[in-house]
Structure formats: C-alpha cells, structure tokens
Amino acid sequence: MPAASTAATTLLQASQSEVLGEIQSNFLLNSSLWVNIALAGVVILLFVAMGRELESSRAKLIWVATMLVPLVSISSYAGLASGLTVGFLQMPPGHALAGQEVLSPWGRYLTWTFSTPMILLALGLLADTDMASLFTAITMDIGMCITGLAAALVTSSHLLRWVFYGISCAFFIAVLYVLLVEWPADAEAAGTSEIFGTLKLLTVVLWLGYPILWALGSEGVALLSVGVTSWGYSGLDILAKYVFAFLLLRWVAANEDTVTQAGMSLGSGGAAPADD
C-alpha cells in the first residue's frame, strides 16, 4: 500500500518530459494528436488557396473566422502532443477510477474555447443574424467550454464534476436553441438556407457527440480508455471543424454574390428589418 501511495505521488508530480513519455507510450493517444496536427496543416494550406479569390469584405470575414479554426487547432494539438497541456489527475471517491491517477488532456478545452466561437461566428455571418443573437450564441458556447473544463479538472468531489457537466450541458442547450430555432429563419431571409441547413445539421449532430464522449470516457464513468476517448474527440474535431469549414468555404467561394447581398452590416438582422 505505501508503495502504491509513493507511485501516486510521483505521478502527480510528474514533469512535462515524463508526461510526454506517457503520451508517446500510448499509441492511440499519441496517434490521435499527430494525425490531427497533420490534417490541420493540410487544411490551413487548402483554405489559404480557397480564400485567395474572395473579394467582398463579408466573404473575407467568413473566411477569416473559418481559417482560425484549423489555426487554433494545430496550435492546441501541438500543446497536447508536447505534453504542455496534459497532466495527471487523481480521481475523487465515487469515481470509477477513484484514487487512481488519470492522464488528462485538458488542453482540448482550450481548443474548443477558441475554435468553436469561430464556427458560430461563421454560421452567424452566413445566416446574416443580428448582433444580439450572435453574441448570445458565442458567449453561451464559451460558457459551455469553460464549465466543461471545470468538470474535467475538479478532483475534490465526484458530485461537483457532474454538477459542472450539467451546467455545461445547459449552456449547450442554449447554443442549440439559437442554431435550431433562431438562425434558420435568418438564413431563409438571407437566401442561404440550403447551405445553412446542411452545416447546422452537421454541427448539431457532431457537437452532441462531445458530451456523450465525456460521460463515457475516463472523465465520466470510465467505460472508454484515454486513448479511445482521444480518438473519439479527434474524429469529431476533424468532421466538425475541417469538413465543416471546407463545405462552408467552398460554398462561399462559389456564391460570393449571395453572401455579399445577404446583409451589409452584422447588426442588420436578416430575419426582420429594424423599425424606424
């Protein structure tokens, strides 16, 4: 028993190089990070080429927002692969892995905090939504990511982990409401409803996978290993970010006139004109 306690202490005080060694020894975890880094690099080059012919400021703004998604991802995944944003956490009593030290790639939450608002910004611009609705969606999204990080890092109480998880899901419901209820009408008025509907469905379905993975992974009930969970997150990121962004930019490049005519200012609101 004392030996186990000593080992636990060593893990908790592990240096960055030791964490890196642990990552590299886990093939599933390590490969899930480097595959994403490689794809992000390819996507960045592709998006640069796709945006070269854009002329209108609105189309360029959508391009910049979309471009930031792989830029944030490659930076964040590099932090994960280097061990910079990964650490060991001792799970609290009541957790399936109570008393054990679990490798926590908490840097993923940094990726989501900075990249998912850009996805929503691009979608909001595409739908020509009003500033208030766009601000609501982005702030709710940031709240979702931050409370998700809290749920992953809390080790003082197993109950509190799930409390933060519930709060994060509540923020997520607010984001879903905006995407499913408010913005479709704006997109219809802006003439972008067809592509918006496709991207909305892709986003909603894939984003629902993240809280499910959290609950099933080592942070939740621990039915999935860290490596399997990491591949799940990486797969969702590839589809929800890179595939989403490619579909959006391809449509914008082919329909720049529609994007330009959708609205000349962010605060115009595509669904209804402002009262005089």
From Swiss-Prot:
Residues spanning the membrane: 26-51, 58-81, 106-127, 131-154, 158-180, 193-216, 226-254
Propeptide residue interval(s): 1-21
Regions of this protein lying in the Cytoplasmic compartment: 52-57, 128-130, 181-192, 255-276
An MF annotation (GO) of this entry: monoatomic ion channel activity
Protein topology in the membrane: Multi-pass membrane protein
One GO BP annotation of this record: phototransduction
Subcellular location: Cell membrane
Segments on the Extracellular face: 22-25, 82-105, 155-157, 217-225
Positions carrying N6-(retinylidene)lysine: K241
Keywords: Cell membrane, Chloride, Chromophore, Ion transport, Membrane, Photoreceptor protein, Receptor, Retinal protein, Sensory transduction, Transmembrane, Transmembrane helix, Transport
InterPro entries found in the cross-reference section: Arc/bac/fun_rhodopsins, Rhodopsin_retinal_BS
PROSITE patterns: BACTERIAL_OPSIN_1, BACTERIAL_OPSIN_RET
Record-level GO cellular component terms: plasma membrane
Gene3D superfamilies referenced in this protein's UniProt entry, alphabetically: Rhodopsin 7-helix transmembrane proteins (1.20.1070.10)
Family as reported in the entry's similarity comment: Belongs to the archaeal/bacterial/fungal opsin family.
Biological role: Light-driven chloride pump.
Protein name as annotated: Cruxhalorhodopsin-3
Organism: Haloarcula vallismortis (Halobacterium vallismortis)
Gene name of the encoded protein: choP3
